Amino acid sequence: MTITGIIAEFNPFHNGHKYLLDQAEGLKIVAMSGNFMQRGEPAIVDKWTRAQMALENGADLVVELPFLVSVQAADFFGQGSVDILDRLGIDSLAFGTEEVLDYQKIADLYTEKGAEMEKFVKNLPDSLSYPQKTQAMWKEFAGLDFSGNTPNHVLALAYAKAVAGRNIKLHPIQRQGAGYHSVNKDVDFASATALRQHQKDQDFLERFMPSVALFEQASKVIWEDYFPLLRYQILSNPDLTTIYQVNQEMAVRIKEAIKTAQSVEELVELVTTKRYTKARVRRLLTYILMQARESDLPEAIHVLGFTEKGRQHLKSLKGQVSLVSRIGKEPWDAMTQKVDQIYQLGKPSIAEQNFGRVPIRIETN
């Protein structure tokens, strides 16, 4: 049987995600971001709620991406996620993308010329942002042109790089309906961005979300809920360069901007430059909020939930892969667990995220 991996945030889970799971084949394993997202934002609803939504709509097994995998630029995010799915035995990786290309061919190209391609990126001027450098590399070596704003396509290329040289087939699925950043309401499939923006519009949610009741009952947070905490962390830290990935230039810009910024959005606007994209700045602010330091990734994989089919698969991995299903005295990943505690500060009503939590079990398949 095919074992398909899917890398996801489900922020929140919508009909487009359900479509992706429906199109994927065989046993479906999802590696999902925890409570903070790849572009440096808190998840609108917590990881357990999102895992439950996925399991109710076609996923067989949901595991959590550690914080230092989930909040990263596309390449590291892709690499770390594929590493985890590879250990769980996937032979195919399904993903949504705006452009359906021969991603397999691109992966093969990277297998063959990876070193040369990375050298090309290293030699590009530092005035370019990392995404611009990556795009220049794909243009040079694969003749790819980037049309406007297509984050899923950028991630898809990161996945192609990550599976290079591994025994994993790529299964691109054309994105249906609204674009990633679209807030349009008159479409067949709404984007997660639109759902976050129209979260109080019940008719809209019911049209585009399969597990709408779960979403409506859950505590919801936005970046602004953490702004006072972020401000405190910036003001009370004499040397921001001790924080993961924060360099001197960024430390100075952030310290200056916090004097006048009245919101996270304003802070991001003030700090962003041509070279440092908004997503990168949001990631740095997330690292500062968490006081993140460089640390090793956890050996074990944290299981958030499974169906009967998923449980059987986990059983077959026993002894080969280190799995954590209950977090007790021994931490699974100290960094991610600290992040979860800070996430809970966003709203007093958010449930405990780790201690005493056990994987969600969905009995029917």
Curated annotation (Swiss-Prot):
Any GO BP? tRNA modification
As for subcellular location, the record says: Cytoplasm
- Key words of the record: ATP-binding, Cytoplasm, Ligase, Nucleotide-binding, RNA-binding, tRNA processing, tRNA-binding
Gene3D superfamilies cross-referenced by the UniProt entry: HUPs (3.40.50.620)
Q: What is this protein called?
A: tRNA(Met) cytidine acetate ligase
Question: ATP-binding among the record's keywords?
Answer: yes
Q: Which family does it belong to?
A: Belongs to the TmcAL family.
Highest taxon above the source species:
Bacteria
**Membrane spanning stretches:** none
The keyword Cell cycle is assigned to this record: no
Q: Which organism is it from?
A: Streptococcus pneumoniae serotype 2 (strain D39 / NCTC 7466)
Judged by the first EC level, this protein's enzyme class is ligase
List of residues binding ATP: 7-20, 96, 152, 175
Q: Show the HAMAP family listed in the entry.
A: TmcAL (MF_01539)
Q: Which Pfam families match?
A: HIGH_NTase1
Can you provide one Gene Ontology molecular function annotated for this UniProt record?
tRNA binding
Per the UniProt record, which EC number(s) apply here? 6.3.4.-
**Protein purpose:** Catalyzes the formation of N(4)-acetylcytidine (ac(4)C) at the wobble position of elongator tRNA(Met), using acetate and ATP as substrates. First activates an acetate ion to form acetyladenylate (Ac-AMP) and then transfers the acetyl group to tRNA to form ac(4)C34.
Gene Ontology CC: cytoplasm
> Which reaction is the catalytic activity of this chain?
cytidine(34) in elongator tRNA(Met) + acetate + ATP = N(4)-acetylcytidine(34) in elongator tRNA(Met) + AMP + diphosphate
